[in-house]
């Protein structure tokens, strides 16, 4: 029996990896590639691509897009890959590959990077460099926590009812205690932007009023404004025939709940429940011509 269980787990893991969507695969490959590039001694990859507040200028703005791919060592890279992969593949399956490309090489990386630089340089007066995909991890944890809050607002511990959207905050402080060398403010910047991108778009008017005292920046719901126009994405997909050319590509018509993470209503049939739908994450099914 144990060998069969081991074989089953291995098969499921292999199937999961083979079904990862395109952008998620590219991110993983890039992280591994930058780690391999850092093994040579000619160019200091960490110094070249890390997010260093005092090194930022017009000529070094590229750091805002390179720092998530660069890691201190193989352990750092592997841990971030394991944490990031399930979160990124869910996001890509819902929003689409082109959306992920535009958002993660744009506002979902640069906004938390600017926020971190502002805090580190102008508030604390420090120059602590950060690198690694953990900022993305906390950003996506914020996104997932808010979506979970919509379905299950609270969980109970003893006699205390705790809002589910606060779970990543607990993870944030636990990480700061367990890994003191990690960047608390870098993680916090990602988490704030993750909350801000989803909170407003997943709450109804009554819930928005109830949460007005805690949502802060989250009320912006800026994903609707930062995501590329759907007409442009459809035009690019059709013009370049991305569905026909790129395996594991996730198109606009392939996403689970629609463009901005609209969750099913209470009247949605059981077959369309969140648990069932997430089982399709990473599917390579192609729709259209």
Curated annotation (Swiss-Prot):
<feature type="transmembrane region" description="Helical">
    <location>
        <begin position="157"/>
        <end position="179"/>
    </location>
</feature>
<feature type="transmembrane region" description="Helical">
    <location>
        <begin position="100"/>
        <end position="120"/>
    </location>
</feature>
<dbReference type="InterPro" id="IPR022764">
    <property type="entry name" value="Peptidase_S54_rhomboid_dom"/>
</dbReference>
<comment type="function">
    <text>Probable rhomboid-type serine protease that catalyzes intramembrane proteolysis.</text>
</comment>
<feature type="active site" description="Nucleophile">
    <location>
        <position position="134"/>
    </location>
</feature>
<keyword id="KW-0472">Membrane</keyword>
<dbReference type="GO" id="GO:0000139">
    <property type="term" value="C:Golgi membrane"/>
</dbReference>
<keyword id="KW-0720">Serine protease</keyword>
<keyword id="KW-0333">Golgi apparatus</keyword>
<keyword id="KW-0645">Protease</keyword>
<feature type="transmembrane region" description="Helical">
    <location>
        <begin position="67"/>
        <end position="87"/>
    </location>
</feature>
<feature type="active site">
    <location>
        <position position="187"/>
    </location>
</feature>
<feature type="transmembrane region" description="Helical">
    <location>
        <begin position="122"/>
        <end position="142"/>
    </location>
</feature>
<feature type="transmembrane region" description="Helical">
    <location>
        <begin position="26"/>
        <end position="46"/>
    </location>
</feature>
<dbReference type="GO" id="GO:0004252">
    <property type="term" value="F:serine-type endopeptidase activity"/>
</dbReference>
<comment type="similarity">
    <text>Belongs to the peptidase S54 family.</text>
</comment>
<protein>
    <recommendedName>
        <fullName>Rhomboid-type serine protease 2</fullName>
        <ecNumber>3.4.21.105</ecNumber>
    </recommendedName>
</protein>
<dbReference type="Pfam" id="PF01694">
    <property type="entry name" value="Rhomboid"/>
</dbReference>
<keyword id="KW-0378">Hydrolase</keyword>
<dbReference type="GO" id="GO:0006508">
    <property type="term" value="P:proteolysis"/>
</dbReference>
<keyword id="KW-0812">Transmembrane</keyword>
<feature type="transmembrane region" description="Helical">
    <location>
        <begin position="184"/>
        <end position="203"/>
    </location>
</feature>
<dbReference type="InterPro" id="IPR035952">
    <property type="entry name" value="Rhomboid-like_sf"/>
</dbReference>
<keyword id="KW-1133">Transmembrane helix</keyword>
């Amino acid at each position: 029996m144990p060998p069969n269980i081991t074989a089953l787990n291995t098969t499921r893991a292999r199937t999961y990896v083979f079904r990862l969507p395109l952008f998620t695969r590219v991110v993983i490959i890039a992280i591994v590639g930058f780690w391999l590039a850092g093994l040579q001694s000619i160019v200091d990859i960490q110094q070249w691509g890390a997010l260093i507040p005092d090194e930022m200028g017009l000529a070094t703005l590229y750091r805002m897009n390179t720092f998530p791919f660069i890691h201190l060592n193989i352990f750092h890279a592997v841990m971030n890959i394991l944490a990031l992969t399930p979160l990124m593949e869910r996001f890509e399956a819902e929003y689409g590959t082109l959306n992920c490309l535009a958002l993660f090489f744009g506002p979902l990386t640069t906004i938390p990077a600017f926020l971190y630089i502002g805090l580190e340089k102008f508030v604390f007066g420090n120059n602590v460099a950060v690198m690694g995909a953990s900022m993305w991890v906390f950003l996506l944890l914020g996104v997932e926590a808010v979506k979970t809050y919509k379905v299950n607002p609270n969980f109970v511990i003893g006699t205390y009812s705790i809002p589910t959207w606060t779970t990543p905050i607990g993870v944030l402080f636990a990480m700061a205690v367990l890994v003191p060398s990690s960047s608390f403010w870098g993680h916090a910047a990602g988490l704030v932007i993750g909350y801000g991108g989803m909170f407003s778009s997943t709450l109804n008017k009554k819930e928005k009023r109830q949460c007005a005292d805690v949502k802060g920046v989250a009320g912006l719901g800026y994903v609707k404004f930062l995501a590329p126009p759907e007409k442009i994405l459809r035009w690019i997909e059709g013009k370049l025939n991305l569905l026909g050319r790129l395996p594991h590509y996730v198109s606009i018509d392939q996403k689970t709940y629609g463009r901005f993470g609209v969750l099913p209503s209470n009247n949605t049939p059981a077959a369309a429940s969140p648990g069932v739908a997430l089982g399709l994450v990473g599917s390579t099914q192609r729709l259209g011509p």
